[in-house]
Regions:
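N-terminal intrinsically disordered, cationic/polar leader segments
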Residues: 4-14, 20-58, 65-66, 70, ...
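A short interface-forming secondary-structure element
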Residues: 76-78
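Hydrophobic (often cysteine-bearing) scaffold residues that line and stabilize catalytic clefts
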Residues: 81
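Alpha-helical support elements that line or immediately flank enzyme active sites
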Residues: 84-95
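Glycine-rich phosphate/pyrophosphate-binding loops
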Residues: 94-111
Length: 146
Protein backbone atom coordinates (compact mmCIF):
# COMPACT_ATOMS: atom_id res chain seq x y z
CA UNK A 1 0.00 0.00 0.00
CA UNK A 2 1.11 3.47 -0.66
CA UNK A 3 1.27 4.87 2.84
CA UNK A 4 -1.92 6.56 4.04
CA UNK A 5 -3.44 6.86 0.57
CA UNK A 6 -6.97 5.82 -0.20
CA UNK A 7 -7.71 3.25 -2.86
CA UNK A 8 -9.08 6.04 -5.04
CA UNK A 9 -5.90 8.10 -4.65
CA UNK A 10 -3.72 5.18 -5.73
CA UNK A 11 -6.06 4.52 -8.66
CA UNK A 12 -5.72 8.17 -9.74
CA UNK A 13 -1.93 7.88 -9.62
CA UNK A 14 -2.05 4.88 -11.94
CA UNK A 15 -4.44 6.68 -14.30
CA UNK A 16 -2.04 9.65 -14.35
CA UNK A 17 0.95 7.40 -15.05
CA UNK A 18 -0.85 5.79 -18.00
CA UNK A 19 -1.99 9.17 -19.37
CA UNK A 20 1.61 9.94 -20.37
CA UNK A 21 1.83 6.80 -22.50
CA UNK A 22 0.61 7.43 -26.02
CA UNK A 23 0.49 4.03 -27.67
CA UNK A 24 -0.60 0.61 -26.52
CA UNK A 25 2.92 -0.65 -27.14
CA UNK A 26 4.14 1.88 -24.56
CA UNK A 27 1.38 0.88 -22.14
CA UNK A 28 2.23 -2.81 -22.45
CA UNK A 29 5.92 -2.02 -21.90
CA UNK A 30 4.96 -0.09 -18.77
CA UNK A 31 2.81 -2.97 -17.51
CA UNK A 32 5.76 -5.33 -18.07
CA UNK A 33 8.01 -2.90 -16.17
CA UNK A 34 5.53 -2.82 -13.27
CA UNK A 35 5.64 -6.60 -13.17
CA UNK A 36 9.43 -6.58 -13.06
CA UNK A 37 9.29 -4.28 -10.04
CA UNK A 38 6.95 -6.59 -8.13
CA UNK A 39 9.03 -8.63 -5.68
CA UNK A 40 9.13 -12.33 -6.54
CA UNK A 41 6.92 -14.43 -4.36
CA UNK A 42 8.77 -16.90 -2.16
CA UNK A 43 8.74 -20.41 -3.63
CA UNK A 44 6.92 -21.81 -0.59
CA UNK A 45 3.84 -19.80 -1.65
CA UNK A 46 3.89 -21.00 -5.26
CA UNK A 47 1.56 -23.91 -4.59
CA UNK A 48 -1.73 -24.99 -6.13
CA UNK A 49 -3.86 -23.67 -3.26
CA UNK A 50 -2.56 -20.14 -3.92
CA UNK A 51 -3.26 -20.11 -7.66
CA UNK A 52 -5.99 -17.90 -9.07
CA UNK A 53 -8.49 -20.03 -10.96
CA UNK A 54 -9.72 -18.51 -14.20
CA UNK A 55 -6.38 -17.15 -15.35
CA UNK A 56 -4.76 -18.47 -18.50
CA UNK A 57 -1.36 -17.78 -16.94
CA UNK A 58 -0.38 -19.08 -13.54
CA UNK A 59 -1.01 -16.44 -10.88
CA UNK A 60 -0.20 -17.00 -7.23
CA UNK A 61 -1.94 -14.79 -4.68
CA UNK A 62 -1.50 -14.83 -0.92
CA UNK A 63 -3.03 -12.56 1.67
CA UNK A 64 -2.32 -11.76 5.28
CA UNK A 65 -4.28 -9.80 7.84
CA UNK A 66 -2.59 -7.60 10.39
CA UNK A 67 -3.84 -4.71 12.52
CA UNK A 68 -7.13 -4.61 10.64
CA UNK A 69 -5.49 -4.38 7.21
CA UNK A 70 -5.25 -6.91 4.39
CA UNK A 71 -1.87 -7.29 2.70
CA UNK A 72 -1.37 -9.07 -0.61
CA UNK A 73 1.62 -10.70 -2.26
CA UNK A 74 1.42 -12.07 -5.77
CA UNK A 75 3.41 -13.39 -8.69
CA UNK A 76 2.83 -14.80 -12.16
CA UNK A 77 4.71 -16.86 -14.70
CA UNK A 78 4.09 -14.28 -17.47
CA UNK A 79 5.29 -10.68 -17.60
CA UNK A 80 2.04 -8.99 -18.66
CA UNK A 81 -0.01 -10.83 -16.04
CA UNK A 82 2.58 -10.08 -13.38
CA UNK A 83 2.26 -6.40 -14.30
CA UNK A 84 -1.53 -6.56 -14.03
CA UNK A 85 -1.48 -8.24 -10.62
CA UNK A 86 1.17 -5.76 -9.44
CA UNK A 87 -1.27 -2.90 -10.08
CA UNK A 88 -4.00 -4.68 -8.12
CA UNK A 89 -1.60 -5.34 -5.22
CA UNK A 90 -0.55 -1.68 -5.29
CA UNK A 91 -4.15 -0.48 -5.17
CA UNK A 92 -5.68 -2.94 -2.70
CA UNK A 93 -2.90 -4.01 -0.33
CA UNK A 94 -2.82 -2.34 3.06
CA UNK A 95 -6.51 -1.47 3.26
CA UNK A 96 -9.35 -2.66 5.45
CA UNK A 97 -11.58 -5.51 4.31
CA UNK A 98 -14.49 -3.09 3.83
CA UNK A 99 -12.41 -0.74 1.68
CA UNK A 100 -11.34 -3.64 -0.53
CA UNK A 101 -14.84 -5.08 -0.78
CA UNK A 102 -16.27 -1.66 -1.72
CA UNK A 103 -13.50 -0.75 -4.18
CA UNK A 104 -14.88 -0.03 -7.66
CA UNK A 105 -11.43 -0.32 -9.30
CA UNK A 106 -12.36 2.20 -11.97
CA UNK A 107 -8.73 2.57 -13.02
CA UNK A 108 -9.02 -0.70 -14.95
CA UNK A 109 -11.52 0.86 -17.36
CA UNK A 110 -9.98 4.32 -17.30
CA UNK A 111 -6.57 3.10 -18.48
CA UNK A 112 -8.24 1.02 -21.19
CA UNK A 113 -7.55 -2.45 -19.87
CA UNK A 114 -11.04 -3.79 -20.48
CA UNK A 115 -10.97 -2.83 -24.15
CA UNK A 116 -7.36 -3.69 -25.00
CA UNK A 117 -6.80 -6.96 -23.18
CA UNK A 118 -7.50 -10.24 -24.90
CA UNK A 119 -10.68 -11.88 -23.60
CA UNK A 120 -8.75 -14.58 -21.73
CA UNK A 121 -6.53 -12.01 -20.02
CA UNK A 122 -9.54 -9.84 -19.19
CA UNK A 123 -11.23 -12.88 -17.62
CA UNK A 124 -8.06 -13.50 -15.64
CA UNK A 125 -8.01 -9.92 -14.40
CA UNK A 126 -11.60 -10.32 -13.16
CA UNK A 127 -10.61 -13.57 -11.44
CA UNK A 128 -7.72 -11.82 -9.66
CA UNK A 129 -10.04 -9.07 -8.41
CA UNK A 130 -12.62 -11.65 -7.32
CA UNK A 131 -9.98 -13.57 -5.33
CA UNK A 132 -8.67 -10.44 -3.65
CA UNK A 133 -12.18 -9.40 -2.64
CA UNK A 134 -12.88 -12.95 -1.42
CA UNK A 135 -9.88 -12.71 0.92
CA UNK A 136 -11.26 -9.39 2.21
CA UNK A 137 -14.69 -10.95 2.78
CA UNK A 138 -13.05 -13.80 4.70
CA UNK A 139 -11.06 -11.43 6.89
CA UNK A 140 -14.17 -9.32 7.52
CA UNK A 141 -16.00 -12.44 8.68
CA UNK A 142 -13.07 -13.23 11.00
CA UNK A 143 -13.39 -9.75 12.55
CA UNK A 144 -16.97 -10.48 13.56
CA UNK A 145 -16.08 -13.76 15.27
CA UNK A 146 -13.21 -12.36 17.32
Amino acid sequence: MEENKTIQQVEEEIIDEFSFLESWDEKYEYIIDLGKRLPDLEEKYKVEENTVKGCQSTVWLVASYENGLVHFKADSNTVITKGLISMLVRVLSGHTPDEIIDAKLEFIDKIGMTTHLAQTRSNGLRAMVKNMKAYAIGYKAMQKTV
